[in-house]
Amino acid sequence: RIVAPNLDAASIMISQEEVRDEMAREGRRPAILDRHLEYGADATIAYVDAAEELLGQLAASGKKPHSLFIAAGAGMTAAGLALGLKHLRSPMRVMAVSTSGRAPDLTPEIEHHAARAAERLRLTTRLSSEDFTVIDDYVASGYGVLTPALADAMRLFARAHGMVIDPVY
């Protein structure tokens, strides 16, 4: 189902529930994988592991970046990477560039996901808002919504680097 862009969270939830109900009427067993359910902890844990792998690859290459910039929607990737880096005592800082939400909303989501993952992994390391940065300066018309400014940026990137990027990036 295609839904209108720029829906608020409540409208998205209603749409998800409508699709779930339609599928249930067809005899299927659909589930909405909400970011606060077990799925969220599993996704976050995967990125805790990814932090260790990333640090290994960086060590092998001899590179020591001070920041790791990533896109952040629900915050699970940022939570896992930041938790993993902190647990492994890496000075690298996660810079979570928000795709849709504002920092005051996304920051506690990242903390929540990290806390659940740490609990499941039985880590004593805990993440706080001091351990990562949420950048919400680039949230515009919506995640992946093509605007004239975005189209211009895509053309500029294509000319400069010889490749076309997806509007999400």
Locate predicted features.
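PLP-dependent amino-acid enzyme catalytic core
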Residues: 1-169
